[in-house]
C-alpha cells in the first residue's frame, strides 16, 4: 500500500460570516434559510445528508441518503426497514444527520431520535416516485449479499412486466422521522477561525432553544 499524505490539500473559507445577530431563534427556520440558499447556489444534491446510526456493539455507521421532508416535527427520509440501517434504528433510535455544502463553506449537524412515519405517509410518498424507483424498492433485499448485478437486473425486468395495479408499497419499506434535540450550524472562515453555533434544549419540556457560540 503506497503511503500518501494530503497535508497540502487545503483552501481558505470565505463565502460568508455567521454572527449571532444573523441567526433565527428557531433552528428549523435557520435550517430552512440555509437549505434554500443551498438549493439555489449548489450544483446538485443539496438535500443529501449523512445519516449516522449505531449498531448493538457500539459501532457507528454512516451513509448518504436524501432528505425528503422537513417541518417543525422533524426530518424525514425513506429506506428499507429490514436493512442494516433499519435494524440499527430498531436497536437504538438515537441518530445524527449531517448536511455539508462545500460551495457555501457550510455544514449543519442535527441529533435526535428516529421513529417510523405513519404508514399512509410512506405509501403516499412511495406512489409519488417514478415506477422504476418503486420497483427497485420492492425487489431489493437491502444490505443482503447478492451474487451478481445480473440477478438484480433480472428481478427488475420481471417486476416491470407486472401490471401497475399490482404495485403496492412493500411493508418492509417506509419513512423515518428524526425529532431533533440538537442543532449545530458551522460556517467556514479564514484562518480556520470558523463560526459555530449550537441550538440546544435544556430539558425535554423546554420549548425554547438556547443558542451558544462554540470555539472552532
Curated annotation (Swiss-Prot):
This is Pyridoxine/pyridoxamine 5'-phosphate oxidase 1. PANTHER family: PYRIDOXINE-5'-PHOSPHATE OXIDASE, PYRIDOXINE-5-PHOSPHATE OXIDASE. The keyword Flavoprotein applies. Its cofactor is FMN. Substrate binds at residues 10-13, 68, 125, 129, 133, 192-194. Keywords: Flavoprotein, FMN, Oxidoreductase, Pyridoxine biosynthesis. Gene3D superfamilies: Electron Transport, Fmn-binding Protein, Chain A (2.30.110.10). It is an enzyme of class 1 (oxidoreductase). Its EC number is 1.4.3.5. Homodimer. Belongs to the pyridoxamine 5'-phosphate oxidase family. It comes from the Bacteria. It comes from Hydrogenovibrio crunogenus (strain DSM 25203 / XCL-2) (Thiomicrospira crunogena). GO terms for biological process: pyridoxine biosynthetic process. InterPro entries: Pyridox_Oxase, Pyridox_Oxase_CS, Pyridox_Oxase_N, Pyridoxamine_oxidase_dimer_C, Split_barrel_FMN-bd. Pathway: Cofactor metabolism; pyridoxal 5'-phosphate salvage; pyridoxal 5'-phosphate from pyridoxamine 5'-phosphate: step 1/1; Cofactor metabolism; pyridoxal 5'-phosphate salvage; pyridoxal 5'-phosphate from pyridoxine 5'-phosphate: step 1/1. The keyword Flavoprotein applies.
